[in-house]
């Protein structure tokens, strides 16, 4: 990265622009010149939505050290303001689902995501925009959840959930069950752009995943039950509840 452009105090340098994924935020491949590692740099502008909230949320995310979360390494609040994160790494969940996953693998992936979000919740952070694009599987087999501390603030989702302190936990919990259903069946329980929708029962709930997932066996009946309870309004209220509902899994 000999042509990288230093920013701020000079510790970080910008090497190349990445495709935009968030409004009014410019993503770059960057370099931490002190630790000699590749990073992702999110450059904010005066037009970035909810700019102050984004910087505050990202600053709290620095304190989350769970390896399953895309780490936020540093936050610069001056001009230019920017956020330094761990690069996204590994294969996206959508690719893995397309190739087919065993029920045990889906249980493990969603369980690991749930535990990671539980760690974030203890810091007052929530994803609120969890999707198949938010989850990756690294080459070493660990999951990586991207966007914590950044996406929700930029999209204004933190503000929408602020009126009810428990609403953010419920949103992430339901999203985890949606990912579980998608991972098992290759169908989305509802409507989502680019994904086929799951068939529904007479009351509008998605059919049990076992009706569509050939990899499920009788021991996976708890997954059917978790889905049914969620669409009956009796589902888990937080990521930690989802993790407990999934029981044990092999994270290797």
Residue ranges and their predicted role:
Residues 30-38:
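Conserved N-lobe loop of protein kinases adjacent to the ATP-binding glycine-rich P-loop
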Residues 45-63:
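AlphaC helix of the eukaryotic protein kinase fold
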Residues 71-81:
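Short beta-strand micro-motifs within the conserved protein kinase catalytic domain, predominantly
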Residues 83-91:
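Short pocket-lining segment of the protein kinase catalytic domain that shapes the ATP-binding cleft
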Residues 93-102:
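AlphaC helix of the protein kinase catalytic domain
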Residues 109-110:
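Activation segment signature within eukaryotic-like protein kinase domains
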Residues 114-125:
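Protein kinase catalytic-loop region centered on the HRD/HxD motif
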Residues 158-251:
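C-terminal lobe helix-coil module of Hanks-type protein kinase domains
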């Amino acid at each position: 990265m000999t042509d990288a452009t230093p920013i701020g105090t000079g510790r970080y340098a910008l090497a190349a622009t990445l495709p935009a994924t968030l409004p009014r935020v410019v993503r770059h491949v960057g370099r931490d010149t002190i630790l000699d590692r590749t990073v992702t740099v999110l450059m904010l502008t005066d037009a970035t939505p909810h700019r102050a909230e984004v910087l505050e949320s990202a600053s709290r995310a620095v304190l989350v050290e769970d390896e399953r979360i895309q780490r936020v390494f540093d936050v610069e609040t001056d001009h230019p303001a920017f956020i330094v994160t761990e690069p996204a790494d590994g294969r996206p969940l959508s690719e893995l689902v397309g190739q087919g996953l065993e029920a045990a693998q889906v249980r493990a992936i969603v369980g690991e995501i749930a535990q990671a979000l539980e760690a974030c919740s203890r810091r007052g952070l929530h994803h609120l925009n969890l999707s198949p694009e938010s989850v990756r599987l690294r080459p070493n087999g660990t999951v990586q959840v991207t966007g914590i501390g950044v996406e929700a603030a930029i999209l204004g989702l933190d503000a929408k959930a602020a009126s009810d302190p428990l609403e953010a936990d419920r949103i992430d919990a339901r999203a985890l069950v949606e990912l579980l259903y998608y991972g098992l069946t290759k169908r989305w329980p509802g409507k989502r752009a680019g994904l086929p929708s799951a068939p529904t029962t007479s009351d509008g709930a998605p059919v049990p995943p076992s009706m569509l997932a050939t990899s499920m066996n009788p021991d996976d009946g708890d997954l059917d039950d978790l889905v049914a309870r969620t669409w009956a309004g009796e589902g888990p209220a937080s990521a930690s509840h989802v993790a407990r509902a999934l029981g044990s899994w092999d994270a290797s």
